[in-house]
């Protein structure tokens, strides 16, 4: 028996079937580094339109987690896709380096005895070490960027740039010093930014406290009475007993009705709607004597329960009728609303009582409770209230309360002298900051769209921004304050530039070591050099200004405005927020044109990632077991607008999808063996109809993918590429062409037409997957035939695809109908295989009973219909002649019948044909194969 295998054009490629990504990816990274890929991209892109994605800096502390990996991969996919789309898309990674977590790490390691200078030195060293570790991990993910020259908020140039940004805001009149309640952490010993506050359940002791009336006559008159028949008091409800020693006022709502309730021993003032619930809580009986509008009680004085001072009634709209009494006790030093209300009534800063120190301990001079920690003092305060007869009720509740995101300990509002950026302060020119920021939000595109309303609400309702901190490791606020007046030096902006120049050379240490006389000369004795540092959100929030326009100069020529900021949804109150405020203050516009928000990672059951639950996914482990491309494929396949589920099982499914895409690429490469595009590429008009359709379909898909990439819809890219590989290629086109590819002459038009299509598809596909499967795309690139540059990323979207000409007989709609017919035939072939009627598809002969229109369509393929259906014979018969045993299909006007062929199997093409054995020199093969071997070769027109 003759072996005809050698006469076939069998697929051949060195591209490995097994990816071996954990071993192969580091080699590809080395190659990118050796060819200077990032630098080459900058060179070829210098005359292109620019696209700037500005990196939100991760904190330089600890190993990266799955959220970091997700974020960096999303950014890389955007930068790569924009590069392929013809943009110059630089990517400068950044790190956030100052702040308490690093200072805390240094204190834990080296102790708290260190000098401030030594602390800063060690903090800088620690941050540098952490950056190197994280950088290695980010590079391992395949993220292309300027890793040799990242921006760091502790770079001298960036520290100086931040001071200059602050100077701009001072110059425009946005910065002021004020006494205001700010989020305060006793463990940090500092104010906290809004973004550093998280909420958790806390048990608190609630108290109802009676404040005896001081102005009896005024209270009686307000309720329309001649006098009060018995002692009277107003009752407040609070969850913070520790604030009672600082009480200075009582707040009621001007529009609520308040009742004077006779409880026997005394009269109580309560919100009318809450009388019943309050009396029940106090276990009292009572009746309403009179009622009055809240506004009628304004400025009536009551007495503090245990201190000899008055608490007047102030009207406030924030009072609610939920839990409580409808009366809020006001400690202006420890509540934002209280502070604003008391200031509105004329209270000056010197009158505001601030008995709680920075460590949470009452000042020693506070009667009854001096020297006690506030949380521990609560029982003593309750006991004192009971002792003086002011305690109406107490109980313990669990409620959501603000905590420090680092220490997980409860916070308080605490009025301290801090530096603020005013939200409603009138600047030297233009609108106030809040107004500017709200307008800028309207001019910004949000992905997903709901981010706009969220950020708008946050800006509309936020207080002034406290930008000062009382820490060592931070960019200084380089102000000189007059010792007598407390005013800023009149040359502050000029002096800040002098400081910035020094910081540019020596880092922030230049300020802390500076002798004031160096800058102020003889004036130095009149001024204090302040020691406050800037909020770290000011560090990262000004990077648009000192990175894009300064240290890296990657911004647009029109100014330091990025095209895109991309971070997790928590950054609406973090980096997006602080950047918006600084951008609007300095440049009167947002520092970004578009904001993209991604959700957080959860496990497959929707639970938060937690070491205690054992459901965390470590990027390093994934890289070492499955490969970074699998992680990248998971990112692309997941809709990032909500929570993103990830687990070992989910990643395994991504690995399965990866194999299908890789196998498709391998099939394409193996069937391009011996193909030289410079020599063998056919013009579109010389190609077979099916091949022209395949190239046209590829072009249509590329247009869709370009749009999905430009709109950051990566899950659609993944879905469409995967379906194209599995269904349109693997399930249709690639199956059909195998016979022609393997059995026709190596240089025949039939085979070269097919290879031309495969070449075009490969050139397009490798680019489509390049932003997602960064390593695999570059690996495929090395195996494609023809001359090419070092990396797929040095190219644009493929331009060699051609469209089916207008009026083509076998057009897109035609092949859609053929695909539907083939799907119906495949279904019946599978049924016959299951029933053991046939062994394989080529053992079958199919008869199609088609209506007139479909019959005409199928007839256009002639004898080549069998190659499309991958059966040994196929015939088309009028629908009316269908026998009873013909199978109905989902295609309208089509029935079909599959029978086992009665002919002999060809030993070369495996078709069962009547003419097998008719050629004496080749008795084992069919006439078609004989012609392909010894004659002029078969001619194909369609498939």
Swiss-Prot record:
Residues the entry annotates as binding L-isoleucyl-5'-AMP: 567
UniProt main location, coarse: cytoplasm
Stored PROSITE patterns: AA_TRNA_LIGASE_I (PS00178)
Reactions listed under catalytic activity: tRNA(Ile) + L-isoleucine + ATP = L-isoleucyl-tRNA(Ile) + AMP + diphosphate
One term under GO cellular component: cytosol
UniProt key word Protease: no
CC cofactor note: Binds 1 zinc ion per subunit.
UniProt entry keywords in alphabetical sequence: Aminoacyl-tRNA synthetase, ATP-binding, Cytoplasm, Ligase, Metal-binding, Nucleotide-binding, Protein biosynthesis, Zinc
Positions of Zn(2+) binding: 906, 909, 926, 929
Motif ('KMSKS' region): 608-612
Cofactor(s) needed for function: Zn(2+)
One GO biological process term: isoleucyl-tRNA aminoacylation
Assigned EC number: 6.1.1.5
Enzyme class: ligase
Cross-referenced InterPro entries: aa-tRNA-synth_I_CS (IPR001412), aa-tRNA-synth_Ia (IPR002300), Anticodon_Ile_BEm (IPR033708), Ile-tRNA-ligase (IPR002301), Ile-tRNA-ligase_type1 (IPR023585), Ile-tRNA_ligase (IPR050081), M/V/L/I-tRNA-synth_anticd-bd (IPR013155), Rossmann-like_a/b/a_fold (IPR014729)
Alphabetized CDD domains for the sequence: Anticodon_Ia_Ile_BEm (cd07960), IleRS_core (cd00818)
Record localization: Cytoplasm
NCBIfam families: ileS
Domain notes: IleRS has two distinct active sites: one for aminoacylation and one for editing. The misactivated valine is translocated from the active site to the editing site, which sterically excludes the correctly activated isoleucine. The single editing site contains two valyl binding pockets, one specific for each substrate (Val-AMP or Val-tRNA(Ile)).
Assembly and oligomerization: Monomer.
Similarity comment text for this entry: Belongs to the class-I aminoacyl-tRNA synthetase family. IleS type 1 subfamily.
Function: Catalyzes the attachment of isoleucine to tRNA(Ile). As IleRS can inadvertently accommodate and process structurally similar amino acids such as valine, to avoid such errors it has two additional distinct tRNA(Ile)-dependent editing activities. One activity is designated as 'pretransfer' editing and involves the hydrolysis of activated Val-AMP. The other activity is designated 'posttransfer' editing and involves deacylation of mischarged Val-tRNA(Ile).
PANTHER family: ISOLEUCINE--TRNA LIGASE, MITOCHONDRIAL (PTHR42765:SF1), SOLEUCYL-TRNA SYNTHETASE (PTHR42765)
Protein name per UniProt: Isoleucine--tRNA ligase
Species per Swiss-Prot/TrEMBL record: Pseudomonas putida (strain ATCC 47054 / DSM 6125 / CFBP 8728 / NCIMB 11950 / KT2440)
GN (gene name): ileS
């Amino acid at each position: 028996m003759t072996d005809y295998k050698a006469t076939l054009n069998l697929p051949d490629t060195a591209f490995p079937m097994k990816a071996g990504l954990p071993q192969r990816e580091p080699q590809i990274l080395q190659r990118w580094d050796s060819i200077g890929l990032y630098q080459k991209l900058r060179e070829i892109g210098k005359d292109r339109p620019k696209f700037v994605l500005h990196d939100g800096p991760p904190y330089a502390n600890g190993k990266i987690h799955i959220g970091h990996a997700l974020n960096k991969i999303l950014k890389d996919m955007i930068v790569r896709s924009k590069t392929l789309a013809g943009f110059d898309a630089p990517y400068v990674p950044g790190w956030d380096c100052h702040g308490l977590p690093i200072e805390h790490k240094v204190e834990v390691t080296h102790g708290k005895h260190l000098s401030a200078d030594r602390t800063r030195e060690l903090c800088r060293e620690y941050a540098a070490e952490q950056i190197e570790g994280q950088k290695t991990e980010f590079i391992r993910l395949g993220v292309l960027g300027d890793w040799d020259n990242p921006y760091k908020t502790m770079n001298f140039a960036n520290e100086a740039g931040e001071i200059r940004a602050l100077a701009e805001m001072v110059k425009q009149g946005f910065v002021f010093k004020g006494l205001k309640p700010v989020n305060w952490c006793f463990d940090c010993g500092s104010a906290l930014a809004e973004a550093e506050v998280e909420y958790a359940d806390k048990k608190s002791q609630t108290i109802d406290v009676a404040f005896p009336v001081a102005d009896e006559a005024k209270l009686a008159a307000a309720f329309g009475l001649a006098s009060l028949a018995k002692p009277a008091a107003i009752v407040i409800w609070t969850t913070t007993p520790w604030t009672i020693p600082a009480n200075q006022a009582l707040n009621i709502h001007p529009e609520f009705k308040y009742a004077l309730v006779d409880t026997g021993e005394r009269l109580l003032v309560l919100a009318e709607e809450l009388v019943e619930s309050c009396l029940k809580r106090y276990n009292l009986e009572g009746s309403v004597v009179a009622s009055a509008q809240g506004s009628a009680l304004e400025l009536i004085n009551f007495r503090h329960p245990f201190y000899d001072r008055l608490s007047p009634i102030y009207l406030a709209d924030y009072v609610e009728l939920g839990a409580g009494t409808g009366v809020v006790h006001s400690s202006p030093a420890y509540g934002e609303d209280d502070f604003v209300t008391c200031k509105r009534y004329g209270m000056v800063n010197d009158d505001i009582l601030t008995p709680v120190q920075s460590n949470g301990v009452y000042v020693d001079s506070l009667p009854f409770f001096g020297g006690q920690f506030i949380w521990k003092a609560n029982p003593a305060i309750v006991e004192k209230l009971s002792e003086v007869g002011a305690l109406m009720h107490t109980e313990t509740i669990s409620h959501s309360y603000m905590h420090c995101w680092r220490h997980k300990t409860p916070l308080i509002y605490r009025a301290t002298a801090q530096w603020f950026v005013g939200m409603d302060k009138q600047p030297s020119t233009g609108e106030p900051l809040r107004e500017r920021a709200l307008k800028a939000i309207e001019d910004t595109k949000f992905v997903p769209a709901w981010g706009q309303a969220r950020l708008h609400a946050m800006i509309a309702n936020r207080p002034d921004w406290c930008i000062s901190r009382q820490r060592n490791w931070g960019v200084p606020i380089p102000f000189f304050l007059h010792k007598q007046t407390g005013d800023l030096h009149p040359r502050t902006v000029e002096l800040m530039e002098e400081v910035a120049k020094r910081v540019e050379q020596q880092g922030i240490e230049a300020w802390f070591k500076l002798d004031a006389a160096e800058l102020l000369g003889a004036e130095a004795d009149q001024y204090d050099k302040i020691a406050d540092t800037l909020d770290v959100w000011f560090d990262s929030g000004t990077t648009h200004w000192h990175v894009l326009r300064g240290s890296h100069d990657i911004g647009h020529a029109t100014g330091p405005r990025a095209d895109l900021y991309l971070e997790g949804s928590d950054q609406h109150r973090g980096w997006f927020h602080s950047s918006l405020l600084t951008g609007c203050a300095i440049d009167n516009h947002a520092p970004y044109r578009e904001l993209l928000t991604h959700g957080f990672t959860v496990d497959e059951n929707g639970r938060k990632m937690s070491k205690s639950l054992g459901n965390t996914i470590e990027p390093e482990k994934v890289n070492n077991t499955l490969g970074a491309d699998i992680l990248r494929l998971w990112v692309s396949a997941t809709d990032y607008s909500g929570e993103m589920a990830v687990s070992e099982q989910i990643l395994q499914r991504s690995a399965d999808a990866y194999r299908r895409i890789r196998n498709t690429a391998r099939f394409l490469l193996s069937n391009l063996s011996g193909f030289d595009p410079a020599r063998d590429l056919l013009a579109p008009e010389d190609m077979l109809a099916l091949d022209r359709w395949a190239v046209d379909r590829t072009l249509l898909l590329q247009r869709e993918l370009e749009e999905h990439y430009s709109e950051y819809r990566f899950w659609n890219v993944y879905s469409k590429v995967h379906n194209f590989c599995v269904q349109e290629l693997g399930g249709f086109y690639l199956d059909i062409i195998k016979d022609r590819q393997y059995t026709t002459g190596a240089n025949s038009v039939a085979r070269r037409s097919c290879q031309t299509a495969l070449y075009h598809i490969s050139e397009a596909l490798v680019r489509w997957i390049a932003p997602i499967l960064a390593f695999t795309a570059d690996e495929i690139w090395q195996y494609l035939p023809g001359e090419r540059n070092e990396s797929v990323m040095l190219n644009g979207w493929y331009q060699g695809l051609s469209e089916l000409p207008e009026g083509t007989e076998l057009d897109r709609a035609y092949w859609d109908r053929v695909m539907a017919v083939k799907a119906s035939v495949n279904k019946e072939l599978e049924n016959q295989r299951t029933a053991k009627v046939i062994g394989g598809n080529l053992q079958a002969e199919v008869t199609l009973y088609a209506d007139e229109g479909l019959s005409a369509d199928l007839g256009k393929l002639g004898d080549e219909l069998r190659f499309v259906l991958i059966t040994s014979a196929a015939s088309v018969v009028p629908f009316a002649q269908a026998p009873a045993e013909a199978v109905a299909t989902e295609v309208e006007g089509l029935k079909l019948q599959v029978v086992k062929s009665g002919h002999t199997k060809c030993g070369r093409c495996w078709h069962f044909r009547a003419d097998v054995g008719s050629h004496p020199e080749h008795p084992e093969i069919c006439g078609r194969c004989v012609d392909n071997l010894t004659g002029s070769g078969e001619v194909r027109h369609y498939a």
